[in-house]
Amino acid sequence: MLNKVKTFIDTHKLLPLDGRYIVGLSGGADSVALLLILKELGYYVEAAHCNFLLRGEESQRDEDFCIKLCKENNIELHLIHFDTAEYAELHKVSIEMAARTLRYNYFEALRHDIDADAICIAHHRDDSVVGNANGVGICI
């Protein structure tokens, strides 16, 4: 698996090894795998976890898992809590659109604040990924 990912990154010239990268960490299998694989390949990664406060105890369990995972793997973790329902109501958008907007705005602000080279997001084939052309790198 590591060799396959490394070959893909190299073939598509996605990530210089000397960069600083933010990995969006939901706590799900895809984002955990991306984070740990990039770290294992020697990339400097920091994780960013958004708690949208939408699923009660389950949201807190995801956050706790991300904290534990990053601590055990010596990875810096950036955490933020959003009142997603309030944002959705205020901006008259769906919960899904509110969460997406909050997440990507946060990732971009964090990228700027810590001078990261790219934001890496794990998606699978059924996900839709929209790239941002203003210098934000999204790795898939």
Regions found by a protein language model. Name each.
Residues 1-140:
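Core alpha/beta nucleotide-donor-binding catalytic domains of modification enzymes
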